[in-house]
Each structure stands twice: as C-alpha cells, then as structure tokens.
Amino acid sequence: MEQASVPSYVNIPPIAKTRSTSHLAPTPEHHRSVSYEDTTTASTSTDSVPEVRIRSESSQVSRESPPIRASKAFVASYEYEAQKDDELNLPLGAIITLVTVETNEDGWYRGELNGKVGLFPSNYAREVTYKDNLVEFKQDEIMLPVAVRTLSDCQIGHGATATVFKMDIKIKKELQNGRMGEAVGDQMKAALKRFNRHASNFRADVVSTDEQLEQLKREANLVNGLSHNNIVRLLGICLEDPYFGLLLELCEGSSLRNVCRNLNSDAAIPLGVLIDWATQVAEGMEYLTKQGYVHRDLKADNVLVKEEVCLCMDEEMFQYAYCLKCGKRPFDKLQLKITDFGVTRKMTADANRFSTAGTYAWLAPEAFKEGTWSEASDVWSYGVVLWELLTREEPYQGHIPATIAFQIANKGQNLSIGDSCPDRWKKLMQDCWNLEPNFRPKFSTLAISFKQYAKEFKDTHLQRAPSKMAVKELYSECFADKTKEEFEKRFHDLYAGSGDINRKNRHSIAPETKARRLKHHKPKKADITGPTEVKHILSVQKDDKNFRVKTYDQSSTGGTLPRLNERQSTLSLSSPDLFHISNLISGSNTVGHSAHRISRKNAIRHKKNQHRMFESPVVSPTMDDSNTFSTIDNADEVDPNHSKESKKGGTLSRAWAKLPWNKRDSKEDHDERAVAGSISSRSSSTTSSNRLITGQTTRGASAAGLLEIGARSRAQSTADGWEDPNTTKKHKVSPSDKRPVKTTNQTERYVKDLEKDTPLRPAQLPPTHRKSALDQTIPASPNSPDSINNFHPMPLSSRRTTANSSSDGAPCYDALVSHSYGAGHGHKNHFGLSDTIPLFPEEPTHYDMGPGRPFGTNGRAIVNQGGDYYGNISGQNYEGFGHGRSINQSTQYYPVGGGCDDYIPIVQKTVIKPTVGEVGNSPYSENIRCATRNVQNPQYIQCKKNQNPRRIPALPMKIQSESNLVTSGMVFTPRDEQLNGIGNSLSSLSLNEPPDIPAPLPPVVTYPIPASLISPSNRVSMSPPTRMAPVLPLGAMSSPRIMDKEILKNSSVEGTEIY
C-alpha cells in the first residue's frame, strides 16, 4: 500500500465492543437483509443514510504513524456509498482487509479496499475468519466422473441462468477433515454450477470477463463460510473455462419436490417423517436468519436431499440406516439441504416452475406488492412448503395461485385439508399465512414447535390417504366455476398494480448506518491537569448610545422617569404631571409649581401616545375640591340581577379586572381622586343615558346658551349629590364605587376608536395637553367668537347628561360658559360647585305647536305643500335675546339624541356674521346650522370627519324654555357626517313614523335677568307634542357644519372672556 493512500488523521478510541453478526449475513442478488427481529423494529434502507458527524481535529494523528494492521477480513454484506472522502465504497461481496477497530467513531472500523484506507460501517460487513477464506480451483483440479466422457453427460440440472453438473474435484488442504462430504482417495464429489454468460445473474446483460470474475468473487463471498447441516455449503469457485462457476456441496437425492412427486400416488408418507422434514427446513432457515440471510425463494424445489432416496416405502426398512433392498436412504433418514440462495438465484428458473403462477404460489403478498423481503416473507413461503409436503401437489395448480391463500386467510382458514388432517399441522400453516407480517411466527419458534410435535407423534403413523381425499374435496369446492371469478377478483385486488415480477428490482432492508459521533470515554489520570490561576474577567464596553439619567429635571415636559438616548418615552407618563401640578392642599386654581405635591402613586398614569382600551386621548380636568363626586338622581338604574350574573361569571370578571387598564381605572384613579379631589367627566357621567351630542356648537354665536347648560347641569348634579352617607347608593358616583356601570354604545370609550387620525387643532395652543380643573377659567382661542352678547342662558333639567361624547366621536369638555350680557355683567358666569344657583321668577308652562313644512333635497323648506309636520313651531311673533326674526318665521325642530328626549330648533338663515380672523380652514359647508350641540372645550376645534360612523340609537331632546329659541336663521345643506337621532343611519327610529316619546314639562327655573328686559313678547307659548316626526332631508348638511358657516358670515360677533 502506498503511503499517499493513508488519510491525514487516524482516531484512536477505546476498543469497540464486538459487533453482533446476526444481521450481517449476505442476501441474494446483490443485496442483504436483516433478521426478522430487525425488520419489525427498523425499516431504514440504505437510500436514507444518516448524517455523518465530522470528527474533531483533536482526535487526528499524524500520517507518519500508520496504525497496526489486524489479520482479519470482512466481506461487504450490503452496498454502501461513501458519504465522506475518508470513507470506503463497499460493493456487495467485496473483501475488506481490517486495519483497526480502534477508531473514534462508534460503529465504524478502518479497513483497506483496493489500495485505499478508510472508514466503513461495521454493521455493513461480516467478519470472515481464516478457515472461511474463499477457495479457488484451477481447471486441472476439476475432473469429470470416471465413466463420463463429456460434460453434458454429467448434467444433473438445468436452468435459465445456470446449469448444474456432477463433478469430481481434487481435495485441498482447506477441504480436509471430511467437512464437505465423503472423499475417495484424494478426490471428492461436488456440484459445478456454471453460469450462462449470455444471461448471467449480473447487473448487465453483456459484461466483460474481468467484471464477471470480480462479481463472481464478491457474490461467492456472501455465502462463503456458512456451515449448517441443513444448508448447502460453498466449496469454492473456478474462474477458468470451461468450469467457470461455483463449486457446491453435492446433493444426490434431487429436490424434495421431486421426491414427493416421484412416489406412488397410493403410497403415504408417515406424518412423523413429514414432521422431521419440516423440522429440518425450519432449523436451516433459522440458521440463515441468524446469519442475516433472507432466502426469498423458499419452496420444496429449493430444498435438496443429500442422499439418494429409497422409494420402496417399506416401513420395516425404516429401522435401518439404508434400505436392504436398494441400498438407499429411507425417508426417515434423509438429510435436507436448503439451496438456491445468494448468487445462485435463478432469475426465471425453469419455465414451468418459475412462471408467474408458480411464483405467486409461494410469494408473500407484502413482498410482491412492496418489493421488500424479510424473515416474515420467508415464513409465508415456509407455510406453502408445509402444504406441499402434506398434499404432494403443486399449489394452486391450473389457477392463479395466491387467490386461494388470500381468500382463506381472510376467513381465518388457509388451505384447510379436512378433518382428517392433524389440527396442529393445520394451525401451524395458518399461522404462517397471517396477512399481518408481524403476527407470523419466527423460524426459531417453528423449529421448537415441530420438535415438540415430533415427540407427541413419535409412535403415531397417520396415512396420507385420508388427508389426500380431504384435499381433493377442497379443490373441488374451491375451484368450482361459480366461485372461480370471485377468487380471481380477490387476487386482482391483492396483486394488481405491482407489475410483473423482476428480481433485479427487488431489494432487502439494510441496517441503519450509525451516525459518526465521537465516543466519550473515561479520562485518564494523565489527562487531568493541575489547578490553574483564578482570574476575574470583566467586559467593558464603550457607551455610544449617549445614555444618561434624568433626576428630578423640572424643565422636562414629559414624565419623571429617566429616558434612554433621548427617545420618545414608551413608559408611563404622570397625569397630573408631577412637575406641573397645582397646590391641591391650598386649593389654588392655577396650574404651576407648588411646594406641596401629591405622591407618585396617587397620580393617574397614562401611556404616552398609547391610549388605553376605550380611553379618549382627551382627558377631563382633574382638579377640584374634595366634594366633586355626586349622585345623579335620575341616572339609569343598575341592573339588580347583575350581582347574580357576576357571581356566575366570577372567573371571567376577575380575569377582566386584572387587566392593566382595569387596574389603573380601579386603583390608580381611585387613589388620585381620593387625594386630589379630582374628577373626569367620563367617570362621573357614564351611568346616564341623558346625553347631549357634541360638536363645534360651542364655538359659535349660539354656543353661549349651551355652554351655560353644561355649567348649570354640573352644578345641579353636584347639589343633588349631597345626601346621607349612610344611604345605600344605587348609582356609580366615583371611581371607588365597585358596582358595575351600565354602559352604552355612545360613551367616549366606545367612539374613541372611530377617530383614526389626530384631529386638527387651532394655532397658538400649548404644545402638550394640560389638564384643567372643573372651576378653572380656560381662556378662549384668540380667533374664537365665543363671546356673545344678548343671548339668554338656557336652563336644563336636573337630569345629568354625558358631556364628553359626540355623535361624530369627537372628545369634548363640560360647559364653560359666559353670561348672557357678556363679560363682567351681572355675576360670575361659571358657577362653582358650592355656589347657590338663583331661580328665574317666571317659567313657561306650555308649548304651542303649529304646522311645519318639509325640507327639500337642497335642505330648504318646501313651500305650498299641504300637510302638517310634527316638530314645527307655530308662526308667532317672537323677539328674544339675540337676533330678531320675522313674525311668520317658522322653525324646523331637529331631533338630537344622546339619551334625552330633547329637540333643537333649526331656523332659516338671517344675520349672524363671523369675527374677522375666525377659523379659516373650517371644512364645514354652508347654508344651515343647528341651533345647539353639546359642549366642547373652546380651545379645540374638531375638524376631522368621522370616517366610520356607528349605528347608535338615541332619543330626541326636548325644549325646556323659550330661551332655547335661537333667533338666527339658518339653511340646511348636506354633510357626510351623521347626527344621532331619528332619521339618520345612527338611529333605530323611523323617519316615517312619529316617535311615541312625549316631551316632558320644563322645570321651574328663575332667571337672574332684569325685569325691564322681560316682556310678554319675549315668550312663546307652545303645547308639548304627543308625537313628533322630525324629518332629516336626503343629502342634508349636519348641524355643526351649518353653524360654522353661520359663524363665518356673522361679522357682529365678538370674543367672550370666560371666567
């Protein structure tokens, strides 16, 4: 071997344990198969080779120190294709010289093949000892028998692939000690199986002489070394013409099939003899299975008889070793040999014996359909051999063979031979024909069973005649014409689609290749080093992120937590800001720095730019006195059954309460409000269904009255809240109240998600939102026309309404109003929570309603059309505080929902002019404007349309006083947005039917107005309608856009200072 062929490294692991060779024996026709035990647990073929693990460099040694060679050889039992450069390609039957078993790869040996040294899987090769080395014979060492002149005269068998001759061979040293048979002098008898070159059993039809020689050697190595009394042994090979072939152990008694068929039909073979024959075949197959062989063509024709058979059938001769009449062996003394496995396999065999019908008779269904063989498939064939021995018939002769076997297997009976057949024999055959391969017995079990069977029937001599008669009856029953078509159909269903049998396409199950993993062996003392010095290694990294920590930075506009890299905060932000919070203890109304600050745990914390679920981005003011929370006398009742329901769903409720936003609402809001005495309009009014719609009406000329409504409503609600603390409250009045709130779909939480984009805000506003107290004065925008003179304040009933929701989803504040006479007239125009609200001396007692007029498609009233329409004020001469109108001017009432049954007037266009510089980018259309909408902080203008209006039911609003009648005329034009109320997509009420909601009588309220200004002409007498059917024309414009248009046209409106 050349030095260059040695790999650059050799791994030296501990000695690998001895590999079991029970699964390494060769398989016929270029392939091997594992034992039956392996096939039931593993089905990995050589086509899916596991990933090979690369060895570490620490296990490599220098090429200058080659390993010590071992004097052993291995024969490749399976074909293996190298997966790495340091591995060997293993052709089937190749002889591998073992280099060493000491590799660092578990299950891998190092060997030499064709001058190359490399690794090979140990379970793909079988060890060959010195005595099993293949013996080669020369041409002159093979001789014809004495009385034979030509080779054809000594022919004893012929097949499509090979011809068998009876020859004399010279005894060699390796064949001494009588291992192969009787020897006469220096010669012994042998069978020469010479292959036909034109139809050889190799992979190609035409191969070169060198290739034939090499393949013959490899395939001879597969069966070499097998030694068993029931296995035909290989004596050697001859590589020279005319004796090119294999030299096998000679069996002069022909095949077991011929023995059974040559007997007289009237002669019966004793059952004890049949049991002995079945035992020998089972023991021979058990040995092959342990050596890793799968026969794949087991039948009576491939079971040979060692000696010539006595056909005298004289039972008296059974007590002798040889027949006294013919000198041959009696039946009970025959030695059976299994042959025709390995390379001697015939591709087609004789035409009559290896036809399609003959093959199906012994072939297991799974082997034919799937093309894989195992011990279980040989067991199936063994059952057919038992049937041959008992019946001495060709199985399924004249018919498709596997049909009967399959049909009887489905019924639980396979080739039953009648009541006269021993039940034990019958059961053994049926077990071999189990359709499930895993349920078939093994050959070792069969051998033991027949040995026990032989002991039981040692003295029993059952004749064959009764059994033969039962078999004949079986044939006549099974092959009747009426059932033949059914049997053929069953056979077609079993074997159809598998194609013709082709042994070149057959393959056996190869063992799984072990992954090349490094062995972990126990370390030696020399490998253990002494103690080393202990070192503490610290990793220091330069800060390139400009990390800094802010500690109580009062110049910061954000929260109080440190920020990394000056990023936008994703943490929580204090609200109120701990750096900009008023002195709550001293009761200051101004926002600024104070020596007294609340603790951080009492502050409301909100995610910056990450609003909580159903949370409005605009929060109500949070600063007021400690008496902020109050009961609402006419709020919706809490469902008395809710407590029972919450008990049933307690697990879900508790889980929902543990969510982050719920925790903050229940704990942090409660702590902050309890200490600071603050309140949000959302938490104090969500229980009420009496709501006013919100919008931009707080910024126009008609907004003053509605702004006053909010202040009066808040004050009224607060005053109503003083009650006995021991009285059980039925409504939620503060965040600390743990009772459930009856929510509606029109709350600010619900409509928050409808605003996808941040609304536009007017100029000159603070960069960030600052919370304001309920009683704190919020200055108007420089361009705001909120200051209105000559507008009488409009009172509202004590029913609390939600002041922070709007029909278009716009967030808003509660009313912050001015006096009807303007700034500085009369009294403080925003009452405090503790102020006494004076009453007006007079109040209207009834309403007079008159016929109205419908609206056209352009929003203008239709004249000269008959019919009365509900919601129209009768034409009376009225002069109110504000702009005048004609005596016959009628006002269309438009329903606005929000939880109360109020209406607002819609009047025709007259004289309102906007202040110069008023909002110039207002997107609202022209022509008409609703008289009132709900309150909104005048610092903000909601300019974004609601892109996703929701269908929210609402009730109309009733008029409480004649001061509600705004005298400005307006014209109604289309707008894309929707208003809550009857006749729009947000209302569940119909336009065609008047609502059954009567307007309740207004409350008694005293107005603080000079008596000189009050006259009978300033009042309008109306009767409350019983049914009102307001009409919103198609394509009409919503009220906020109408009002904005009127504001822009009113040049006489001046700014208002709000206290």
From Swiss-Prot:
Interacts with max-2; the interaction is independent of max-2 and mlk-1 kinase activities. May interact (via NPQY motif when phosphorylated on tyrosine residue) with shc-1 (via PID domain); the interaction may facilitate mek-1 phosphorylation by bringing mlk-1 and mek-1 together. Interacts with svh-2 (via cytoplasmic domain). Interacts with tpa-1. Its cofactor is Mg(2+). A motif (NPQY motif) lies at residues 937-940. The active site is at residue 297. Residues 1-66, 617-699, 714-808 are annotated as: Disordered. Gene3D superfamilies: SH3 Domains, Transferase(Phosphotransferase) domain 1. Keywords: ATP-binding, Coiled coil, Kinase, Magnesium, Metal-binding, Nucleotide-binding, Phosphoprotein, Serine/threonine-protein kinase, SH3 domain, Stress response, Transferase, Ubl conjugation. Expressed in pharynx, intestine, hypodermis, neurons and body muscles. Residues 623-633, 690-699, 774-790, 798-808 have a biased composition (Polar residues). Its EC number is 2.7.11.25. Residues 199-224 form a coiled coil. Residues 38-48, 678-689 have a biased composition (Low complexity). It catalyses: L-seryl-[protein] + ATP = O-phospho-L-seryl-[protein] + ADP + H(+); L-threonyl-[protein] + ATP = O-phospho-L-threonyl-[protein] + ADP + H(+). The lineage of its organism: Eukaryota, Metazoa, Ecdysozoa, Nematoda, Chromadorea. This is Mitogen-activated protein kinase kinase kinase mlk-1.
